[in-house]
Amino acid sequence: MGLLLLVLILTPSLAAYRHPDFPLLEKAQQLLQSTGSPYSTNCWLCTSSSTETPGTAYPASPREWTSIEAELHISYRWDPNLKGLMRPANSLLSTVKQDFPDIRQKPPIFGPIFTNINLMGIAPICVTAKRKNGTNVGTLPSTVCNVTFTVDSNQQTYQTYTHNQFRHQPRFPKPPNITFPQGTLLDKSSRFCQGRPSSCSTRNFWFRPADYNQCLQISNLSSTAEWVLLDQTRNSLFWENKTKGANQSQTPCVQVLAGMTIATSYLGISAVSEFFGTSLTPLFHFHISTCLKTQGAFYICGQLIHQCLPSNWTGTCTIGYVTPDIFIAPGNLSLPIPIYGNSQLPRVRRAIHFIPLLAGLGILAGTGTGIAGITKASLTYSQLSKEIANNIDTMAKALTTMQEQIDSLAAVVLQNRRGLDMLTAAQGGICLALDEKCCFWVNQSGKVQDNIRQLLNQASSLRERATQGWLNWEGTWKWFSWVLPLTGPLVSLLLLLLFGPCLLNLITQFVSSRLQAIKLQTNLSAGRRPRNIQESPF
């Protein structure tokens, strides 16, 4: 009965089950709570672990449509009817590969990188492509789009070269046509439609140079002071602030809208062969896909998130940013472990653990020969207390190292800040030069050091309580390790000395009585009258 009660006490409860992915966080939570750490009052930034809704998408602003940079990836296919022009065709292809730095060298990875993403807010611009036999990348509903540009689904672009034009870079004779809702665009003359392109745009862009007299203002996205302009000769967007000067921003090498429209078409290269008169000989087709070069930006197509759009894509997409589900844990939690409740985790059936049973049997066996089992259990608890104290020391050292790194980084940042303020002193400092809010770092390293000092004091207190007590259990156990092997023989000898004489006397009486009984039985069988053993023979 006592053994059964011990097993019931030591067997862990099977009702609750913690997810196996969080053992380290659970141990950290228990450690901080058991030591009364002041870090339990801090707020923790948490992210959701759910794979069904990994995050939220936010659309890019109209101005970001003009500044986010895209890049192209070109794949080519030789025409099966190519005749006699392999050498000049290879020459043209090598020229394209060498002279286009805005072309992506490594092949992109297609396919959604996130699924089940919800778009928050209204996208200022969406692009729709409807291609037969195209690759569907997802479709946003029209209700979440302010302005939707639709790429002409019937347009196919070709370019014809003569045999002496192979050294020239191929260009689209015109960009893929896009349509837009009536009344969305207004004719405006602005030098901003020429943009302020970086060095690669003017030399390697796929379209003809822009004409600032053919500039259209997107009225739905513009205000009195700020205009969003569309250049239809290059399918490029520009942002203009009427209250500022011309040096406002630079146009990327490949804009997002241009890349998205280029990826819906292909460039067919043909040549007039000098060997076959004036007949056109197809050489190869350029199939172009597009990716976002700006880090952190993605194509949002319905609930699918892409980093690259394949050639001949179809669907409705915008651009934006993706953030995981972020929330703040309550301040009274040391770590956000309770957020993962048991109701959200799968229950697992487990068999009864035999370790507590064996521990109980070991303690009972120890009590049968002495106090070895109780001594060992007490020593185990003492060692556990020491391990906790050592863990606290390790954590305090890690926090100290992290704080030293933060202090060092803060010193470097502040030094750079002073240098930037000196360089931009004529403009009022770096904050005024950037026209942004000034941000400052509040040094709270003193609080962190005080908390670390408290942790070290608590660790010392735990270690002292573990080493103190009756006979100092650690030293006592070393002495018991020598005595325990002799306990069995000593106990056996003691029992023999205590009960040996009594056992010997009982054995002697038993043997004597048996001998008398045998002698009496012998006399009766011989026919002699048995003599009374009590009377005297005389």
UniProtKB/Swiss-Prot annotation:
Q: Which BP terms in the Gene Ontology apply to this protein?
A: syncytium formation; syncytium formation by plasma membrane fusion
**Which Pfam families does the record associate with it?**
TLV_coat
Q: Place the motif CX6CC on the sequence.
A: 431-439
Disulfide bridge positions per record: 43-46, 43-439, 431-438
- Signal peptide bounds: 1-15
Q: List site positions: Cleavage.
A: 350-351
**Keyword Transmembrane helix recorded:** yes
PTM comment: Specific enzymatic cleavages in vivo yield the mature SU and TM proteins. The CXXC motif is highly conserved across a broad range of retroviral envelope proteins. It is thought to participate in the formation of a labile disulfide bond possibly with the CX6CC motif present in the transmembrane protein.
Q: Where on this chain is CXXC (motif)?
A: 43-46
Q: Name one GO cellular component term.
A: plasma membrane
Q: Which UniProt keywords apply?
A: Cell membrane, Cleavage on pair of basic residues, Disulfide bond, ERV, Glycoprotein, Membrane, Signal, Transmembrane, Transmembrane helix, Transposable element, Viral envelope protein, Virion
- Extracellular topological domain residue ranges: 16-478
Annotated region (Fusion peptide) at 354-374
CDD domains in the cross-refs:
HTLV-1-like_HR1-HR2
Q: Where is this motif: CKS-17?
A: 414-430
What broad class describes the main subcellular location of this protein?
Answer: virion
**Cytoplasmic side of membrane:** 500-538
TM region(s), chain numbering: 479-499
Glycosylation site positions: 133, 146, 177, 220, 241, 247, 312, 332, 443
Q: Assembly state and interactors?
A: The surface and transmembrane proteins form a heterodimer. They are attached by non-covalent interactions or by a labile interchain disulfide bond.
Entry text on domains: The CKS-17 immunosuppressive domain is present in many retroviral envelope proteins. As a synthetic peptide, it inhibits immune function in vitro and in vivo.
Function of this protein? Answer: This endogenous retroviral envelope protein has retained its original fusogenic properties and participates in trophoblast fusion and the formation of a syncytium during placenta morphogenesis. The interaction with MFSD2A is apparently important for this process.
Q: Which PANTHER family match?
A: SYNCYTIN-2, VIRAL ENVELOPE PROTEIN
Query: Anything further noted?
Result: Ortholog of the human HERV-FRD_6p24.1 envelope protein.
Similarity field: Belongs to the gamma type-C retroviral envelope protein family. HERV class-I FRD env subfamily.
Q: What is this protein called?
A: Syncytin-2
